[in-house]
Amino acid sequence: MTGGNKVGFLKDIKNKVLIYDGSKGFMLQLAGLPAGDSPESFNSSHPEIVFNLHKAYVDAGCDVIQTNTFTGNRIMLEKHGLGDKTVELNRAGAIVAKRAAGENAYVAASIGPTGMLFEPFGKLTFSRAYDIYKEQVLAVADGGTDIINFETFTDILEIKAALLAAKENTELPVICSMAFEKNKRTLMGTEPASCARILKSCGADLVGANCSFGPNHMIDIIAEMAKTGEYLSVKPNAGLPRVENGKTVYDQCAVDFADDLIKYFNLNVRLIGGCCGTTPDYIKELLKRKTLSKYSGDVDARPYLCSQSSSIPVTDIFSIGKVIITDGTDEYDAADDIQEMAYGEKDAIEIVYIGADENRLGDIIARIPGIGKKPLIISSDNDKALINALRTYPGIAGIRSDLKNKYGAVVV
């Protein structure tokens, strides 16, 4: 298997299981990274330490290793006074990982969330998120990474912005991996199957879950994703962390962790490794148990409409609430109408836009909290306004026309 071949990676995940690497942050701290410092700073200041970490995973048998760039977006780096070094540190991270991988492994750029909330709860906008991730993906692509891996995201809208930034500015395969809570939803309330459907509809090559406690908690999440029929990526933690003698340890040893991952192989998982608390020893044990099993569970291939917190098969939509918006519509009145329907008994909400402003429809949808409660059908004779709204909608919307789009919208 040769690194630097995106076609090879996409072919491989269709035919076999690839082994991912494990945690890097914890191992960097053991190697001298001061607590609270930016891990990405080591890409430039201590590249040999980062190289040795990557090489340990390659030597353990990993097919795919990840760059040391998880908190490498500009927002996160600014917390360490390193915002102006965003491009430098990400490019350096890709270069050192490629050097360690050689011809023996693919290199995936690890990219995590900004830690910010979207409007109206925070200050992040879709366009700003897009620009932040565009900067990072271009830097790691310039450094030679083979794959883009967005991981540990909790907001479907943020990872959608990241995904589009990667797809529209590089030709690299993209993995999208979400983190889930104990209730088996993301922090923002999205179900596993909805995550898979939304992200695949926007062009993700592989979807999945990572972090999120340990293997025994994540199995139900992956089982729900498997029902969509998509190939999956999974990277659980080594159980739960605890502090012993002032040090963080995890409650699963390498053998137990690998044993618990055996049941994942028949759930369409094609990329599997570890997250927090795992080391090359965990990967060695996992490699001993690797197998390729055909998924034999039920597959729900029906087209779905998905909001941030609910989904419904198109065939099951019976009642639709309608809100008409024009350029003169008061935004607060529209919000009140949508909020009322969102908490009512309607299956979906149709927003009909009649106007010339290309951005108004998308702006209104982005700023209404209740918009995530019920799936949307978005209608407009203004194609540009409709496209802009679909682009920033955190789900799979319904549309009334055969308008070509790359945002997964379903004709209803």
Model-derived features: positions:
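Domain-level signal for soluble alpha/beta catalytic cores
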Residues: 1-412
